[in-house]
C-alpha cells in the first residue's frame, strides 16, 4: 500500500511522453487501488454495523478510529519524508525545509481546537447513526454534505455560487427526501446523528481549507495534529459514557465476547486508516474529476455491499432515492470542477502585459513566523485544481519540496 502511495508526484499526473506500457501499468495500479479502496470502505462500514449491533458503544468505536489515526500517521509521515513545518522561501532555487513549529500559535485556539472538537463530535455522531439506522441510509444522508457546504460557505465565508451549482443540489435534496420517506428501518435519532455528522464534516471542510491555505502545512500533517487533539475530547467522553457502563453493567455477555469484539475494533480502525491513505494515493494518480467519479462509485459500492451483507429490507423506491442523491453529488462535483477551472483560466495571464498588470493584485504576505511566510486571502485559493466537499478530499498546490506535492487524505 505504501509503495503504491509513494509513486511520486510525476506518476500522479500521468507523465507526458510515457509509453503505452507505462500507461497500462498506471491504469492497472489505479484499478487495484480503487478496488482496495472500495473493499476497505465497504468492509469497514459492514464491520462497524456488526460491532454496533452486538456492542452498542459508538464512542468506543470512534476512539479506536482516532487512536489508529494517531498511531499510523506518524510513521507514514516519516516514511514519506513529509516536513514537520511548511516549506519556506529563501536564497537559491526552490523552497527550503522549515524547522519551526507546525503552525503559528494563534492557529491553535482559533482553528485547531475547534476542528479537533468537530472531528471528535463528527466521528461519534457518524457511528451513532450507523448504530441506529442501516448503513445504506446513513450514507445516503451523508450525500447532503454539498448542501451544507454551500449554505455554510455563504453564511460564514460570504462565498457565492453559480446558478448551476445551486441547481445541482436539487437531485441531492430530492434523493435524500425520497430515501427518507421510504426507509423501512427509519429512526429519528439515526437521521439526526447522520445530519449532525454531515454538518460537522462540512464545517471541518470550510475551516480546514482555510488553515491549509493560510499556513501551507501538509494536509496529512494537519490531519495528524487534529487526530492527536481529538483524543483529548474523546477520552473523557469514553470514560463517562462507555467505561462507566462497562464497570457497572451486570450483563457478562460483553466479557465473554471481548476477544472477538477487540478483533473487530482493530479491523475497523485499520480499515478507516487504510482507506484514507489509499484515497490519498488515488488522487495522486488521477485527475480530481476522475476522483469524484471514483468516490461516487465507492459510495454506491458501500450501499450495495451493505444491502447484500446485512440484508436490511429496502424497496425499489428507496434504492431510487439513494441513487438519485449519489448522482446529485457527482453532478455537484462536476459543476464545481468546471467553475474552478473557469476561475483558474481567468487568473492565468495571456501575455506579458497581462502578467504585469495583474502583479499588483497579488495579496500581501503576513509577517514571517520563524521564517515561514503565510499568505493571506488573495489568489492562493485559485491555485488549487479542485476543492471538493470534504477535508479528506481537498487538494492543495504546494511547492515540490517533498516527494508528494499533489495530495489528498
Curated annotation (Swiss-Prot):
Signal peptide: none annotated. The keyword Transmembrane applies. Keywords: Membrane, Phosphoprotein, Transmembrane, Transmembrane helix, Transport. The keyword Transmembrane applies. It is a multi-pass membrane protein. It is found in: Membrane. InterPro entries: Sugar_P_trans_dom, TPT_transporter. The chain crosses the membrane at residues 50-70, 111-131, 133-153, 165-184, 188-207, 222-242, 252-274, 282-303, 312-332. GO terms for cellular component: Golgi apparatus; membrane. It comes from the Eukaryota. The modification Phosphoserine is found at residue 363. Putative transporter. Belongs to the TPT transporter family. SLC35E subfamily. This is Solute carrier family 35 member E1. The lineage of its organism: Eukaryota, Metazoa, Chordata, Craniata, Vertebrata.
